[in-house]
């Protein structure tokens, strides 16, 4: 009971900081249960983990607001935003040294993500957050913690997690928007589309460091030839530009909106909040933004559809390197994304390896085919669509070669799209491509077997399938992770560079990838399982049990967000320790 908590606080006041450890446990606060899950070691350490549980009966939310994963995730996102707004007003109002008085929850961006900050269970809602337990030096200041737990938090919780305290109409619109967005995404295949951009969308962002919509920007207007209408379950009829499956080229002068459109499409794999401007920019959920990554690690990837007959006789059907070139990195990225189940590739000429994308006629005359190991993307894009079902949306500004293979050509003119397919196709006959001989298209084969690196120990690790991955009886040394925002993280002594995994949008997703990779290395990498087998195991249990499945004690804190399966593949493929 909360009375006992108050008594405990008063009994440990002015004692040394470790006495806070005795507060771990559950406390009933009437209409919610407070759980102190982890107590920080000292006031300068990472803050303590605290959570609350509220029954569905007490929260009062309509059942249809959490009837499935989509609505449940959306409701949790809304509640997390409300709670974060409330607790930010009280952070550091309790005084002390170090992180004393810190009160913080997950800070959400423009996209809706599934976060451990708020989860819906059969019994109710669980919210997780961080609290800096106050101290003067390293002496407990329980009076200040009492303010947080008994004065500040109850107000924040009441205003954030109870239906009667919230704007019911705003929440309804929030849920209905998410359902409409998902309806469009599910409708795309039936309409033979890979993406949709609604009329009136605001695509430009406020600045390079802000993802909020730019004020006074030009609303998106679809060309008539590509305009379609969709009847949504809640909003009703909307119109916009449907991008057909196949090969789509986005062209135009500099600063006319080509990359802005592509950036909106790459984030269209996520649902967006009301007022974002891109609420109805919807992309195939499996879409992957690809680029060259000089220096990246590649292990056992079949890039032979793009690169063959290397001078060093390296086998490109099972290619490995510690320091990839632009072309080999982009080839590997495409093959890895195919393995990850992508049906749509998004590319920008500006961030691609030029020699990987195209070879002009003059270069083909100078460098004979048998002397060039690279089969450019230009010569594989049609096969990728016709034989593998993978569409491409490409931003191009310098080479006209792609006009010949494009099914749809969109010109961005001062942020206004124009369908110029017919007029460009007439011009193609005046600028024919030279005849080329391309080897037959074959789907790549996965070769990568994941083995545990030496630093994670060769001793016995019990995995969740109930078998053993090695011999021995001692407990293995656990690897530590350090997160660096969306740029990547370290696991043990290995750095995982995710700077160019552009659809990784939140540091909490990076933290989740660190958790998943750590689990894979410690429990699954045994020298027998392939990378796809391991990713599918991770994804299955993530979907069924959530991220807590991958922690040592099956408990999770605030600070994690679920990544897509495509980013899980990208993370494991970039881990040099395997």
Question: Where do the protein language model's features map onto the residues?
Answer:
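N-terminal accessory targeting/assembly segments
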Residues: 1-192, 203
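Flexible beta-alpha connector loops of hexameric P-loop NTPases
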Residues: 141, 296, 306-327, 359-374
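Carboxylate/His-rich catalytic cores and anion/metal-binding grooves
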Residues: 189-195, 199, 255, 262-293, ...
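N-terminal pre-Walker A segment at the start of P-loop NTPase domains
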Residues: 204-239, 274, 282-287, 291-298, ...
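Glycine-rich phosphate-binding P-loop
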Residues: 238-270
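Conserved alpha-helical scaffold flanking the Walker A/P-loop in AAA+ ATPase domains
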Residues: 325-337
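Conserved P-loop NTPase nucleotide-binding/switch module
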Residues: 337-381, 385, 398-404, 408-425
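Conserved NTP phosphate-binding and transfer environment spanning the P-loop NTPase/kinase superfamily
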Residues: 386-389, 395-578
């Amino acid at each position: 009971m909360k009375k006992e908590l108050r008594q405990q606080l008063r009994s440990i006041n002015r004692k040394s900081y470790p006495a806070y450890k005795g507060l771990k446990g559950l406390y009933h606060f009437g209409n919610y249960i407070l759980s102190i899950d982890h107590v920080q070691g000292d006031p300068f350490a990472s803050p303590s983990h605290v959570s609350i549980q509220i029954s569905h009966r007490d929260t009062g939310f309509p059942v249809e607001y959490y009837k499935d994963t989509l609505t449940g995730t959306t409701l949790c996102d809304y509640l997390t935003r409300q709670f974060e707004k409330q607790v930010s007003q009280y952070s550091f109002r309790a005084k002390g040294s170090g992180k004393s008085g810190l009160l913080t929850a997950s800070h959400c961006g423009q996209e809706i993500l599934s976060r451990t900050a708020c989860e819906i269970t059969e019994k109710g809602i669980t919210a997780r957050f961080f609290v800096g337990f106050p101290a003067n030096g390293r002496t407990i200041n329980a009076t200040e913690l009492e303010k947080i737990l008994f004065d500040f938090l109850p107000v924040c919780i009441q205003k954030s997690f109870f239906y009667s305290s919230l704007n019911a109409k705003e929440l309804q619109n929030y849920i209905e928007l998410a359902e409409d967005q998902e309806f469009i995404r599910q409708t795309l295949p039936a309409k033979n589309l890979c993406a949709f951009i609604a009329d009136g969308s605001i695509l430009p962002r406020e600045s390079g460091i802000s993802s909020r919509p730019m004020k006074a920007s030009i609303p998106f207007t679809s060309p008539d030839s590509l305009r379609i209408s969709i009847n949504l379950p809640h909003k009703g009829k909307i119109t916009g530009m449907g991008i057909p499956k196949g090969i789509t080229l986005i062209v135009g002068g500099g600063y006319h909106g080509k990359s802005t459109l592509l950036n909106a499409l790459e984030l269209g794999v996520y649902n967006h909040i009301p007022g974002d401007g891109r609420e109805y920019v919807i992309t195939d959920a499996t879409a992957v933004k690809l680029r060259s990554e000089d220096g990246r690690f590649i292990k056992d990837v079949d890039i032979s559809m793009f690169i063959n007959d290397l001078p060093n006789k390296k086998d490109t059907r099972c290619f490995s390197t510690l320091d990839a070139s632009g072309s080999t990195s982009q080839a590997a990225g495409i093959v890895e994304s195919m393995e990850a189940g992508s049906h749509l590739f998004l590319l920008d000429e500006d961030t691609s390896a030029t020699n990987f994308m195209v070879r002009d006629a003059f270069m083909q005359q100078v460098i004979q085919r048998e002397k060039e190991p690279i089969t450019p993307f230009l010569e594989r894009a049609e096969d990728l669509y016709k034989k593998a079902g993978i569409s491409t949306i490409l931003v191009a500004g310098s080479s006209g070669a792609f006009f010949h293979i494009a099914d749809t050509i969109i010109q961005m003119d001062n942020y206004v799209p124009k369908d110029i397919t017919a007029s460009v196709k007439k011009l193609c006959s005046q600028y024919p491509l030279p005849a080329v001989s391309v080897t037959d298209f074959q789907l790549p084969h996965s070769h990568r077997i994941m083995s545990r690196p030496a630093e994670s120990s060769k001793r016995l690790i019990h995995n969740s399938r109930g078998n053993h991955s090695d011999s021995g009886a001692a407990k293995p040394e656990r690897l530590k992770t350090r997160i660096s925002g969306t740029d990547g993280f370290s696991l043990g002594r290995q750095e995982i560079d995710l700077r160019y995994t552009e659809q990784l949008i939140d540091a909490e997703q990076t933290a989740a990838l660190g958790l998943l990779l750590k689990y894979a290395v410690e429990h699954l990498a045994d020298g027998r399982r392939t990378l796809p087998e391991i990713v599918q195991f991770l994804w299955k249990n993530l979907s069924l049990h959530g991220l807590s499945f991958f922690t040592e004690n099956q408990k999770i804190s605030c600070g994690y967000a679920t990544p897509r399966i495509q980013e899980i593949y990208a993370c494991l493929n970039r881990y040099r320790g395997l």
